Each structure stands twice: as structure tokens, then as C-alpha cells.
Amino acid sequence: MKKRKVGIPRALLYYYYFPFWLKLFSELNLEPVISDSTSRDLLNKGVKKSLSEICVPIKVMIGHVLNLDQKDVDYIFMPRFRSLKKDVVLCPKFLGLPDMIRHSLPGLKTEVIADQIDSKSDDIAQFSNHQKLAETFSITKREMKSALKKATDFWQRYRDLLFKGYLIDDFAGIEELEILEKVITKFENDPKPPQSRDQNLEAPVNEEVVDIAVIGYVYNIFDQYINMDIINKLKEMGVRVHSFSMVAEETIEKELSNLRKPMFWEFTNKLYGAAEHYLKNDGIDGVIHLTAFGCGPDSMLGQILEVDAKEYEKTFMTLRIDEQTGESHIITRIEAFIDLMRLKKENN
Amino acid sequence: MNNLYLGVDIGSVSINIVAIDEENELVFKLYTRNSGNPIELVKEGLAKLREEIELENYKISGVGVTGSGRQLIAYVLGADTVKNEITAHARASTYYHPEAGTIFEIGGQDSKLIIVEDGIAVDFAMNTVCAAGTGSFLDHQAERLGVPIEEFGGLALEADRDVRIAGRCTVFAESDMISKQQYGFTKPEIINGLSEALVRNYMNNLVRNRVLEGEYIFQGGVAANIGIKAAFEEEIGAEVIVPEHHDVMGAIGIAMLAKRDVKRSGQESSFRGFDLTEQEFETTSFECEDCANNCEVIKVIADSKVIAVTGDRCGKWTASLIGDSAANANVEGSSEKEEKTAAKSSKKQDEDLNKNSEELEANLYKVDLEKEKQVMKELEELEKSDENKKEDNSLV
């Protein structure tokens, strides 16, 4: 029998969970189809069909769903992430995402599978989170559970590499499970450290290497189109790039417990914990908060970080991205930011 | 033969060219309005430089370009250093004013705040998407009120009464000004209100909760406006210094940076020479249709020879200039660069670990019946507690 095709939008938490989904679908004998990388055309289509005041990551998501709708897939897989921790939810836009898609795209041909994800941790491999998927393809509970187990084990290997200092960017372009497996195995056995830990990194002529933590949601910092490829721009300028996904869960928890009242949103809390860790860390020269224009949760996070950066005397900058951001303004800002840190180092 | 370093600042409203010598003394200074053709203006500027100084005594040893239009002009000139205007401004003002603590810089298109400690810039802020409170807005309003921009600031000081004008947004500011005019406020009062609004806006958007310390330096094209300077002094309650060369500080700074870079690398300047004033430059653009990004690719042509290509996100057109063979290799990988490298690395590792990986895989996914059973049991238990959890959650 021909494998049925399930489309996965390359947007939002795709960057966090894609190894899990690739493995899961392969175990279930389904063919995952990933939407194209974000491009001008894809974003324009998304913007046209979105509410005008919604944030750009959601507009990107809508663009990706439209892209999949034209790819002749049997279903579109887009879970409703509700919670990954007790008493903490995700941003309301995640909670309402499937409804928003239904409302914004009444002409969508492809059926959407929208399981609700309610988990106690980042591990989302519970059967209850995949009931609709199982029903749609008449998968038995037993089969599903065994596939989920394998998927989560595979995802855990990916996560361990992230904790070791690899960037999601090092994997995110890969769509084939076989290639991903090989890359993961390779990195696991690689004696060479990842870029963020590389002490022998070479900066452009006569300049010093600096360490910068880029604090932002996975879908903002790893979507190369929407952020003007900031990660690679930083790398080219001789920067070791750090991100929240490298910080151990315990460290994040510990930092969070210092907050009198944690925020309501899962990934905002994660960013907070990681950012605090980096602000206190002497090995980090500066922190960039990369945020999408109009992001509600970040309006709180950004303020807290601004105040704390001053307290820890860490060089700090907020970069805002939106649908139409000229590349030159991003370059001007990151260049000036890096210059600040290099001057500081030179004078010490 | 003395060394001379050129600094060029291509702003949205003005184009500035300076030349400094080994001791950072200003040998040449030119401030021109950007009428829209930066290449021609730079050529004219260089021609003027050639007329004014005796070139036999000097050698151009370094060229730096800054400002929002820096990229294109850097290709035209063959610049050694291309850097953002924040670093350039900070460099120049900390040189002239080592005691500086706060630098206000307001240019044509954007405004900046630079915080300095012990002669080093430690923090900066730049206006976001909106152009309220920048030079071009003032230009526009001066034109609307029929006041030459040079007299604009002086008029503000003649105001008798205070008028409050909304400074948050240029559209609102303009409608506010019109209605206040209709109430009978005089031009000086309106202009004074506008200056105050501009400074208020600057404080709200850029300074925010930063603590400002002296000396206070005010530079950029707008610093020529004594009305704005007065409004700043009123707002912070201290004297504000406008440097002598406030209008070309960016150009001076980038010239100093070019000098540093050339010295560090020990290489000859890549300046294309004064002959470029006689060359014909042309820029053409086309929309690349090789992927869904449809980048606008810009070509810079000097005497019918392409000297630079820019604007492509993937870099394949930029690379096409370097050499045909290199270009061919790049064209293939253009839009899916990272995928290609991933595939490449996996291929490489294929060779290294071919046997190993198969073994590894086999081991990893070997089904151990005993273990499987136990895992399933564990999962089931988790499941149960999860289901209980779900009920709880529904009440949340």
C-alpha cells in the first residue's frame, strides 16, 4: 500500500520537535512532508490570510499551512500545544492555533490533525497526546505507544546534543530521517566541540572572538528568513553563539525559582531561566533578546531582562523582527553591539 | 609624502566626506545634502578634495565608509573599512571629548543614543521603525511652514508661550501642529513646541530608564538646530556640547577606524584611486526568480565592467563575481545551503563510519521483548496518571 503523506509545517515548535515527529511518522509507516523553508513568497501568502495585528510567527505558520495545502498531502499535522508543565501553559496563540487556522483559511482542502498536547514535561510522547492521530490512521494503542517510545528516545538524543552546545540550526535544515540519524550519530562521536564551545574559533582578521547568547523562541532565532539569518551573520563576525536550548533544565528551574512569581507561558519561562544563567555567566560577553514585534509574553520578559542586564552589568540589546525588516538595520545593530564588546575586551 | 585617511558617511539626508592626517587633524571637510545620487555626489566630493589639497604631498592610505548607504559606495571607492554609523560616531566623539558620558546623535533617518564610560561606548539605543523626531521630519515641517531649515532652530527661541505638540508619531504631530496653528499660535511657538516634542520622544523611546551622565554631547545634522539643543538642555537640566564638526562626526570616526584597520593589517589601501571620478558608474537591478525569495539583486557597473553584486540572500550572484567556476558550484547549493552541507557531512561520515553506523543502528533499535514489556507497563501507568491529570486540567 502506498504510504500516506502527512504534512508538517516548518514553523513554530517544529524546530524543537521535528526529530520526534520524523521518527514517529517513520515508525508509523507514514510519509512526513515538510513545508518549504520560509521565503518572501510564503510569508506574503501567510500575511494576506492572517489577522493584521497578529505576530509574525503566526503569519509564518499560516504561510506554511498554505504551502502544505498545495503539496498534495493527505493530512496536515498541527498539534495544539497546551501545556508542557504543571500549571503552566503556552502563549494563547498556541492554544488557539488550530481554531485560528480554521477561521483564517476556510478554503483549506487538507484535513488538519490537531491533537491536544498536555504533558508534564517537554517529553510529549504520551498516548493521550496522539489519540486523534491514532484514530485517523487506525493505529492500535500498542503500535502507537511503541512508536512514541522510539520517537522520544530519538528526540532525547537530539536534545542531549543541544545541551552539549549544538545549535538547532545545525540540524534544522534536514528533512530526511536517515540523514538526521547519521548526523546525530556523527555529532555524538565527534571529538571536535560544537561551535559554541570551540575555544580555537577564528574571528575575522585581527578581531577577538566574543560569546553572545541569543535569547529568543526557536521559531524566531532559527527561521533564517524571518530573522535575516542572524545566527550565521553572528558566526561570520566571529561570535560563538549560545541559545536557551543549551541550558540544562535544572539550571532553568533554579533560576525560575528566584522569580517571585513565574510567568504563565512555558517558553517565556525557559527563556527567562536561560537568560538569567547567561547574564550571570562570565564566559558570556553579551545578551541579545530577539523578539517578534507585538509579542505579548516578550513585553514582560524583555523588561525583566533589561533591568537584570543592568544589574549584572552585561551588554544587552533587544532586536525586533517583523514582516518587513530591512537587513541593513539588523546588521548595523549587531555590528555596533559586537564592537562594544570588542572595545571592552581590548581595554581590559 | 604624508598619509591621508578618507572618511565617507552616506546618510539619508547628507553625504559627508572628510580627510584626516596621521595626527587626526582635519585636512578636508565637506557636508552636502543627499539629493538622491550618492555615487555622483561622492565623485564630485572627491574632485573637490583633489582641487583643495595638494595631492603631491599626500597619499591616500586608508578609506572608510559608514552610513545607511555604505555598502554601495564602499564598492565604488574600494574601501578598507565598512562599518556602522554607531561605532563611527562613538569613535569620533570620544576622541574629541574624552570626558563624554552621553552622546545624543540625531541624523536624517534615525536617532541614536550612545552611553560612554571611561572613553569607551558601553551601551547604545537606536530608534525603531518610526522616524518621528529625526532630521527628515524636521525638514518636512520646515518646508510646510515655509521656514528655511537653517533658521528653524533660531525661531524656536523666540517663542513666548508654550504649546504642547504630540511627539509620539509624525502623523499625529503634524495634525496637532495644524490645529494649534489654527488656534492662533505663532510659528516660533509651534516650532518650539515641536522641538520639545522631539526631545520628549527621544527621551521616551531611546533613553527610557537609563541614567544619563555628563558630559553630554549632541551631534549629527540636527545638532545645528539651536532650538533642539535648548530643548535638550531644558529636559536634562545640564549643558549640552555641540562639537565643532558635529555634522561630519560619522565621517571623521570612520576615517579613524580605517586608519586603525590599515595599520593593524599592515596592508596597502584598496582605494580605487582618484581616477574613479572620471569613471561612469551605473547600478542596475533585477529580480532573481530562482527561488521563492525573489530577491532584488543590485549590480554595480564601472565603465561597463561589473564591480559588485549585492542584495541576494543566498549569495550566489555575489559569488558569481569571484569566478565562474566558484559560481557554478554555488548556484547549485543556493537556496538549500544548509541542507547541502548536512548531506555533505553525512556523506563524509558515511565513508568513515559506514560499518559502525549500521551496527549502531541495529543495536539501538533491537527489540528486547522483556524490556519492551516493562516499558509498556511503565507507559501504561504513566498514562493512567495522565488521564487523571487531564480531568484536573479541564477545570483549570
Regions found by a protein language model. Name each.
Chain B
Residues 30-35, 53-86, 122-123:
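Short beta-strand-loop/turn "lid" adjacent to the catalytic site in phosphate-handling enzymes
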Residues 175-204:
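Adenine-nucleotide phosphate-binding core of ATP-dependent small-molecule kinases
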Residues 4-47, 124, 128-129:
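Short glycine-rich, Thr/Ser-proximal phosphate-binding strand/loop in the N-terminal lobe
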Residues 2-23, 100-116, 291, 296-300:
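Gly/Thr-rich phosphate-binding beta-strand-loop-beta motif of the actin/hexokinase/Hsp70
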Residues 260-331, 335, 350-357:
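Acidic, glycine/GT-rich loop-and beta-edge segments that sit at the periphery of enzyme/chaperone cores
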Residues 91, 135-139, 244-271:
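Glycine-rich phosphate-binding/hydrolytic loop that grips phosphoryl groups
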Residues 66-69, 197, 208-235, 243-250:
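Glycine-rich phosphate-binding loops at beta-strand->alpha-helix junctions
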Residues 35-39, 118-161, 169, 260, ...:
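Glycine-rich phosphate-binding loop plus the immediately following alpha-helix
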